Amino acid sequence: MSILSFLLGEKKKTASVAKERLQIILAHERSSHSAPADYLPALQRELVAVISKYVKIGNDDIKVNLERQDNLEVLEVKIEIPQA
């Protein structure tokens, strides 16, 4: 190990980065095959209604996603807010 590589740290190999990305994609695909929660569309509509009181947004500006892994459920909400 050279001093330069010690100071700068080792870079991840391209294969390991690709493997990590593939694992993330596979986990997402597996979770999307399960039945979606019934409340997600209503939740998305209500979020649009509440946020629209303060900022002009549309239905396409909010993405709601529910991911399930083993005993864990993660609710992800992405909101695109226009710049002032």
Curated annotation (Swiss-Prot):
Residues spanning the membrane: none
Keywords from the UniProt entry: Cell cycle, Cell division
Keyword Cell cycle: yes
Gene3D superfamilies: Cell division topological specificity factor MinE (3.30.1070.10)
Superkingdom, taxonomy of origin: Bacteria
Similarity comment: Belongs to the MinE family.
NCBIfam families in UniProt: minE (TIGR01215), PRK00296.1 (NF001422), PRK13989.1 (NF010595)
Function: Prevents the cell division inhibition by proteins MinC and MinD at internal division sites while permitting inhibition at polar sites. This ensures cell division at the proper site by restricting the formation of a division septum at the midpoint of the long axis of the cell.
Name assigned to this protein: Cell division topological specificity factor
The gene coding this protein: minE
